[in-house]
UniProtKB/Swiss-Prot annotation:
Subunit structure: Homotrimer.
Organism lineage string: Bacteria, Pseudomonadati, Pseudomonadota, Gammaproteobacteria, Enterobacterales
Localisation per UniProt entry: Cell surface; Cell outer membrane
Membrane spanning residue stretches: 369-379, 383-394, 401-407, 411-422
Location of region: Outer membrane translocation of the passenger domain: 331-369
Annotated GO biological process: cell adhesion; protein transport
Region (Surface exposed passenger domain): 26-330
Function of the molecule: Collagen-binding outer membrane protein forming a fibrillar matrix on the bacterial cell surface. Promotes initial attachment and invasion of eukaryotic cells. Also protects the bacteria by being responsible for agglutination, serum resistance, complement inactivation and phagocytosis resistance.
Deletion phenotype: Decreased binding to host cells and to host collagen I under dynamic flow conditions.
Organism of derivation: Yersinia enterocolitica
This protein's domain notes: The signal peptide, cleaved at the inner membrane, guides the autotransporter protein to the periplasmic space. Then, insertion of the C-terminal translocator domain in the outer membrane forms a hydrophilic pore for the translocation of the passenger domain to the bacterial cell surface. The crystallized section of the passenger domain is an entwined trimer, and forms a bent coiled coil 8 nm long and 2.2 nm in diameter. It includes a transition from a right-handed to left-handed coiled coil which occurs over 14 residues.
NCBIfam families the UniProt entry points to: YadA_autotrans
Effect of residue 156 to Y: Loss of collagen-binding activity
Protein name (database record): Adhesin YadA
Amino acid sequence: MTKDFKISVSAALISALFSSPYAFANNDEVHFTAVQISPNSDPDSHVMIFQPEVRAPGGTNALAKGTHSIAVGASAEAAERAAVAVGAGSIATGVNSVAIGPLSKALGDSAVTYGAGSTAQKDGVAIGARASTSDTGVAVGFNSKVDAKNSVSIGHSSHVAVDHDYSIAIGDRSKTDRKNSVSIGHESLNRQLTHLAAGTKDTDAVNVAQLKKEIEKTQENANKKSAEVLGIANNYTDSKSAETLENARKEAFDLSNDALDMAKKHSNSVARTTLETAEEHTNKKSAETLASANVYADSKSSHTLKTANSYTDVTVSNSTKKAIRESNQYTDHKFHQLDNRLDKLDTRVDKGLASSAALNSLFQPYGVGKVNFTAGVGGYRSSQALAIGSGYRVNESVALKAGVAYAGSSDVMYNASFNIEW
């Protein structure tokens, strides 16, 4: 040989090579059936390991076309510089690519495959029978697949799907469902992460112990705030209930006094008018009677006087009785109306207090981001009310609540509140 040329072959490969009639030669015309190792880039030096041509049907030659490339196995092909193809039908088409295993394919620069039927694209690594990966991906395990860039799939039949770039699937049949994710199962196969240390940074995972501690702390704070809010609400309700009751009583007393004054004034006015009318009528009749008596004084003085006196007595008595009767009827009617108004007012007060009690029984949501629906009943004396409401806790400090109460007929009471804590 005109130039130094070094070949390093593993013990297994040397044993395989020399178990058959292989030889070294400087002959450009030699054909190769199972093994071919290319010379270096100097065209004057062609050092090869070969076996005399024995063609199978369709051809079984190994082909190392790239500089410093190696092809071992029937129909193995190393097409680019420093490529290695080992195994029947293996193909290494990229620079520095390695395909080991029957029908394995390293189809890009620096791609590496190991396993029967495995496939790797540029800068990818596929280890395991039928494992496959796209550019810059890593697939380890039988039938593991990486169809997205810069992703990793480890485990039997694990899979990183198309467009799920920068994702990782770990475990038997694990599958990803989005970008930038780590999957240890799939929709119907869930796994647990065990022996997980407590997280210390914002981007660390939280274990169950940490979660329980935070839940207990949150519940404690919620109970404390709930007690404070309940106390404030009860105080407010008590003050408003007392104020409402006092206002109702005052209004009832005012209405009663007004009605009584009106009745008295009207009764006095009617009585006075009736009396004046009676007196006027009596005086008129008396004058008429007296005139008639004077005309007939000579012939019927005694009879006329008797008749006049009788008529006057009857007329005055009837007019007076009628005036008193009308006055009594009017007064009774007004007092009856007053009683009805007082009864209605009393009923409205009872319904208002029952509605207030029902609204106060509604709950406020305690969970952050939770919406609640609540219902309650209330009663006061013989009146009852039903209340419904809803609330929403925006965060730990802010909450909203609204409710409406119905006490029958058209008696409806409602409220709404906004709560902020610090």
